[in-house]
Amino acid sequence: MSLPTDRKYTESHEWVQAEGDVFVVGITDNAQEQLGDLVFVGDVKVGATLKAGETAGVVESVKAASDIYAPVDGEIVAFNDELEANPSLINESAYTAWIFKIKPANAADLDKLLDAAGYQAVAG
């Protein structure tokens, strides 16, 4: 499994990349492979304030549905609207098709997440 090293990861298979004062969040290639062809990405509430680990949205495939979790405490500030019409963008390129952006309550929380090697150890 080849993972980008320019971002952090969660044990629940989200990737997180700092972009200015917000974090961009998506699901890992491993997660999209397990789910299969995605048919829906959504239920992300822009403006919602979440704690790390709380449900931020959902991804659904023909065979399963899975929650997407907030990687850090913060406020959801954007949803990738392109995914409403074309959720398969995640299947095509999991590391460029972001799902939501979160403004962290504490930017240092990024350092608490897994690096690529740590995620690889968890994900197998």
Swiss-Prot record:
GO cellular component labels: cytosol; glycine cleavage complex
Domain Lipoyl-binding: 22-103
CDD domains hit by this protein: GCS_H
Pfam families the record matches: GCV_H (PF01597)
Biological processes annotated in GO: glycine decarboxylation via glycine cleavage system
Top-level taxon: Bacteria
InterPro entries, per the entry: 2-oxoA_DH_lipoyl-BS (IPR003016), Biotin_lipoyl (IPR000089), GCV_H (IPR002930), GCV_H/Fam206 (IPR033753), GCV_H_sub (IPR017453), Single_hybrid_motif (IPR011053)
Modified residues (N6-lipoyllysine): 63
Cofactor: (R)-lipoate
Keywords: Lipoyl
Binding note for cofactor: Binds 1 lipoyl cofactor covalently.
Entry's family note: Belongs to the GcvH family.
Job of this protein: The glycine cleavage system catalyzes the degradation of glycine. The H protein shuttles the methylamine group of glycine from the P protein to the T protein.
NCBIfam families: gcvH, PRK01202.1
Record's subunit section: The glycine cleavage system is composed of four proteins: P, T, L and H.
Protein name: Glycine cleavage system H protein
